[in-house]
Amino acid sequence: MLSLAHFLVLGAILFAISIVGIFLNRKNVIVLLMALELLLLAVNMNFVAFSHYMGDLAGQVFVFFILTVAAAESAIGLAILVVLFRNLDTINVDDMDTLKG
């Protein structure tokens, strides 16, 4: 049977991978969004693990709120990406300061 430590280590590994992804790929918007989603999923895994082992459902309910905010954040980020690509024909983060409107 898996213990709490197994889930926390997996969450920490996912969190570290996402932080590395954010720092190494700061030019591409798609990679940044994927790394941010992985970061939120790592936090969600820790919430669910603690909630399960403590016998409280509050952490699992909080995960649904985080997933809802993450979905809205992804939709807004992809909308900005589409506008950036239509106007500038690039998805480079450095070119985002030229958007007006």
From Swiss-Prot:
NDH-1 is composed of 14 different subunits. Subunits NuoA, H, J, K, L, M, N constitute the membrane sector of the complex. Its EC number is 7.1.1.-. NDH-1 shuttles electrons from NADH, via FMN and iron-sulfur (Fe-S) centers, to quinones in the respiratory chain. The immediate electron acceptor for the enzyme in this species is believed to be ubiquinone. Couples the redox reaction to proton translocation (for every two electrons transferred, four hydrogen ions are translocated across the cytoplasmic membrane), and thus conserves the redox energy in a proton gradient. It comes from the Bacteria. HAMAP family: NDH1_NuoK. The chain crosses the membrane at residues 4-24, 30-50, 61-81. It is found in: Cell inner membrane. The gene is nuoK. PANTHER family: NADH DEHYDROGENASE SUBUNIT 4L-RELATED, NADH-UBIQUINONE OXIDOREDUCTASE SUBUNIT ND4L. The keyword Cell inner membrane applies. It comes from Cupriavidus metallidurans (strain ATCC 43123 / DSM 2839 / NBRC 102507 / CH34) (Ralstonia metallidurans). Belongs to the complex I subunit 4L family. InterPro entries: NADH_UbQ_OxRdtase_chain4L/K, NUOK/Mnh_C1-like. GO terms for molecular function: NADH:ubiquinone reductase (non-electrogenic) activity; quinone binding. One of its GO terms (biological process) is ATP synthesis coupled electron transport. It is a multi-pass membrane protein. Keywords: Cell inner membrane, Cell membrane, Membrane, NAD, Quinone, Translocase, Transmembrane, Transmembrane helix, Transport, Ubiquinone. GO terms for cellular component: NADH dehydrogenase complex; plasma membrane. This is NADH-quinone oxidoreductase subunit K. It catalyses: a quinone + NADH + 5 H(+)(in) = a quinol + NAD(+) + 4 H(+)(out). It is an enzyme of class 7 (translocase).
